[in-house]
Amino acid sequence: TKVIHVNYKSAQVDQVYFPQIEVVGDIALSVDALAAALGSKLDIDLGDFEKVRDNVKENIFRLAEEPTFPMRPQEIVSEIRNLMGYHDIIALDNGVYKIWFARNYLAFQPNTILLDNALATMGAGLPSAMLAALIHPNRKVMSICGDGGFMMNSQEIETAVRLNLNLVVLILNDNSYGMIRWKQAGSGFADWGLEYNNPDFVKYAESYGAHGH
């Protein structure tokens, strides 16, 4: 088996990713050229892919359709997907909730899910949503943040209000660093340095002239 890397830049080879062949250039043109070079169509049963797709969808929606309190992450993802149109944009900050959105939020158009997955930059969700709202003022834009990530750049609410940007910020609040808790537990460590106090986010938003709910 050979791994073919198709991208606009060279691969970053490491111990887990080492492609044998690299195609560097325009991705669409590269894929078209590869398809033409293959000649006859490959004998692939697309029904197998459809079964995998259907199983993934079933798993996504199964728990989302079982209302609970507090809400399950799957239910939150499903509710937001239902509220947003196919061209609307969500911008994810970095936290443990991001995993649920990355796995379960169905995307129908390119660049409608914005997330900094590799660098895991906390505080990126709100600025990303602001830029999306500037570029696409007629689309719905939602920034989805944990409380920790939101507070790292929360002062930009003032900028968003001043520029009259059309966006919503959803804060998933647990008064702690959830991703770090998960990683500490996975490494066998006890919780340490994870919990903190937050402001009243409704009043905090209103202090900048935004609407808090």
Range-by-range predicted roles:
Residues 1-50:
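Glycine-rich, acidic loop regions that bind phosphate or pyrophosphate groups
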Residues 5, 91, 144-145:
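Generic enzyme active-site microenvironment
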Residues 8, 94, 174:
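Residues immediately flanking
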Residues 13-16, 22-24, 28-34, 100-213:
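Thiamine diphosphate
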Residues 23-27, 31, 42-49, 53, ...:
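Generic structural signal for well-ordered, non-membrane alpha-helical segments
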Residues 54-138:
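Active-site diphosphate/adenylate-binding microenvironment
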